[in-house]
Amino acid sequence: MIKVGVIGAGGYTGGELLRLLAFHPKVVIAFAQSNSQAGKSVAAVHDDLFQLKDLYFLSNPPLLADVIFLCMGHGKSSIFMQENVIPNGVKCIDLGNDFRLDSSFIYGLPELNHENIRTAERIANPGCFASAIQLALLPFAENHLLNNSIHIHAITGSTGAGQALSDTTHFSWRSSNISVYKAFDHQHIPEIVRSLKQLQPDFNQDLHFIPMRGDFTRGILASIYFESDVSQADLDDLFSSYYKNQPFTKVTDLNPHLKMVVNTNNCVVQVKKQGKCVHIISVLDNLLKGASGQAVQNMNLMFGYPENEGLNLKSTAF
């Protein structure tokens, strides 16, 4: 058994992480930290976690654990690392964006960095959009087939914005609504480009990324296309070969939709040749494969557990 601690456990990703850890057979939760919820029972804040009614949020717990997860929001993890000394031998998995381009952290996309994650002490968990998009493109990059501009439209649920209230997270604004934000300038683009260059060093194509807010709570659907002369048969071979030993990325001929993946750590991908273009659809749960589930997947690899330990989850389906 390993002892785990969660910093920033009062929000959406922190709460989802506690849900996974509470049922993980190889884990004991050592502490749950939250400045805003300090002194409250975890079950009083995350009211489905009845079994954690005796675990209380602490504002400043001693960092005594085998691994610490940082779920603090973007820009806050680096401050935490500056102000706190993580003891030697304590591993760290950051779910924010602070260290995704930092060479002192291993980028935690198992489908890209599987073996490096196994020996890592510090992991930077990928972004949710970045995960969905990379899993659609990695087989092409590995075979140096990304040679034209890439067009991406992707929509995310409201939990992707976090728990803090804002104008665009109010129910009355989000419900029955859809909107574009950060067109061509989303913060996940640099980490996507870096990963593609890791496999295809000469990659220098434009990523035309249009992110969208949806009126649902969970899930990401990414629709991606670019010109390519690769045949459908070769596309099928590329994807089946790349993902044959990856337990959470599923390649399908069916039309992917969110109900296939919500409440799971799976990413479902379809690839089709459409005239002169290749079209890829990628779907995942932004709180699981896009955040907390992938963090647990990384933890499993770091400690030598089966990759799917504690992550055999069922989709909502309907």
Region locations from a protein language model:
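N-terminal Rossmann-like NAD(P) cofactor-binding subdomain of oxidoreductases
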Residues: M1-A183, D202, K272-Q274, A317
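Short amphipathic alpha-helical segments
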Residues: T119, I220-A222, K276-V278
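Electropositive phosphate-/nucleotide-binding environments in soluble metabolic enzymes
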Residues: G11, H74, A130-S131, K182-P190, ...
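Predominant activation on well-ordered alpha-helical scaffold segments within soluble catalytic domains
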Residues: L18, Q134-A141, I189-V193, S240, ...
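C-terminal substrate-binding/catalytic lobe of Rossmann-fold NAD(P)-dependent dehydrogenases
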Residues: D185-V251
